[in-house]
Every structure is written in structure tokens, then in C-alpha cells.
Amino acid sequence: MLYPSQGRFRAFTFNFTALVLIGCLIQVAGSFSPAESGHAKGPPKKAEGTSPQKKAEALGIKFEKLQPGYLNGCNRSGKLLFTSGFASKTKGRLGKDLTTKQGYEAARECAVEILRAVWDRHGTLDGLRVVKVLGCVNSAPDFVEQPKVINGCSDMLHQVFGAKTDGYHARSALGFVSLPNGAAVEIEAIFEIKD
């Protein structure tokens, strides 16, 4: 006959023995080298083309030093980079001359110029975080799809910097009765230097 205290002691002994055996198994499993187990040592390597700079180049964006203009295309203040407004080559008014899809492509044109200006100032797109985008859309009075137009820029920044990481930004998308030289879209952005 077992007394209650003896039953608890045997249960404790069994649990303790089981823990010791599990610990031994973990030690044995951990003693194999990565080479023996067929696994590479260390963390997996990043796939080529995963840096923002390489992603942008993979999208076909060419980077070269820009000629100085009347104003600075990208200015640095502390750890922030502020771009000038970059107008699309596409001209016209959304809701009158152009469709939302055409406006979306015009916003991508602006994104390319923003990335070139940032690269020209900073020397690389790596090590940056997109903070804010301000998009201006040349709009007919009843046109209300400015956010869908500026998605063209945001989507490209997501492609380059990551939609849920460094490319995840705040944004304003506004309608204007006209833009300089009849441009369909003009966009400016703020970036943060992470390091």
C-alpha cells in the first residue's frame, strides 16, 4: 500500500527522470555539426537582388549623377532626405484627358525620378526608410480617385523598399485644378537614413 506522500515522490522521480532524458537527447542532437547534418552553417543567405538598390535596378531604373539645376532635387537635413516635387512627363487632367490607369503610370514616372534624386544625393537606396509621400494630381472638378493615382508611386516604393517594412509610408493624395507645365501628377517624398 502506498501512502499519498510516496505516490507524489514516485511521480516526481518519474518526471525528473523524463526531463533528464530529454536533456540528454537535446545535447546529443546539438553535438552534430551543420556539415554532418547536411545543413549550411549560419543563417540562410539572402537571395540576390533583395537590397533596395538591386530591386530598383531590376525594375530597369538607371542611376547616374544628375546635373545641378536651379533647385536641389534632394536635400539632406540631419537623418532626413527631402525631395523636390517631381512632375510626370505625362500631361493632362485626370477625369478629363486621362484615365485613372494612365494617372497611375504617371505616378510611377514620378517615383522613378524621386529614386534617382535620392540616389544622386545619398549614393545608394540601401539603408533608407520611406517616411512620407505627398502626391498632387491634376484633376477635373468631379475626379475623386487621387489615391488610386498616387498608388502608382506607393506601389513602386513598396516594390523597392518593402510594403510592410521600410517602404511602408504615410501619404497624402490631393487634387489640384492645374500643375506646372500641365503635368498629370507631381510627387515629393521624405526618406529617413536608418544608419
Predicted features, each with a name:
Residues 6, 16-18, 32-34, 38:
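Compositionally biased regions
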Residues 23-134, 139-195:
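N-terminal presequence-like segments and the immediate start of the first folded domain
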Residues 1-3, 19-22, 51:
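Intrinsic structural disorder
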Residues 10-24:
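Sec-dependent N-terminal signal peptides
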Residues 1-12:
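N-terminal secretory signal peptides that target proteins for export/translocation
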